[in-house]
């Protein structure tokens, strides 16, 4: 089981495939996604990696989190999340995961917080049909009608579809397709919609119900470290 990644939702657009068909895609961007900490079987009782993404101002980061990031020798992160991994897919602290972690055609599960809609009625929230427009109907055109039973059971069952708060919930969409990736700009293009508003952080994992492609990198696609070579000096004659 590989680690997932954290990406920011940029928005939606469309691209054209080789057959000339337009494909609606959601654009996700990875911003310096690094491993911040490890969870091991010996110390924590399970194996996982903690990832951090984006950049946060030091003044807006708590003292405890500043120390946490300093231990990993990484800059303060805007978003931190943990992903369960198998022992053979553990990633070193400080390593940066790139968008090449996923391959075109791969199925993934995406998790995000849906856009909040506030308090909504049953027609918008549950797609009910509403009441009659006329013929004796007054002020009950968009209501849900009766909600209870009679003396037995004498209550409204839990889970009854009624008006209430809509949206702003954590949702996972399974088996969405990776259309393509752009390593230079750090972009992931996913077919269809992804829960969340523009600018929201999205968790992207390998699909739980579909086999991992054989060409997917393991344990992850890691950006190679840039070596700062010292400038050559002229030897003394």
Swiss-Prot record:
One of its GO terms (cellular component) is cytosolic large ribosomal subunit. Gene3D superfamilies: 3.30.160.810, Translation factors. The keyword Ribosomal protein applies. Residues 129-155 are annotated as: Disordered. One of its GO terms (molecular function) is structural constituent of ribosome. One of its GO terms (biological process) is translation. Methylated by PrmB. Keywords: Methylation, Ribonucleoprotein, Ribosomal protein, RNA-binding, rRNA-binding. The modification N5-methylglutamine is found at residue 151. Residues 135-150 have a biased composition (Polar residues). It holds the Pfam family Ribosomal_L3. InterPro entries: Ribosomal_uL3, Ribosomal_uL3_bac/org-type, Ribosomal_uL3_CS, Transl_B-barrel_sf. One of the primary rRNA binding proteins, it binds directly near the 3'-end of the 23S rRNA, where it nucleates assembly of the 50S subunit. HAMAP family: Ribosomal_uL3_B (MF_01325_B). Part of the 50S ribosomal subunit. Forms a cluster with proteins L14 and L19. Belongs to the universal ribosomal protein uL3 family. This is Large ribosomal subunit protein uL3. It comes from Mesorhizobium japonicum (strain LMG 29417 / CECT 9101 / MAFF 303099) (Mesorhizobium loti (strain MAFF 303099)).
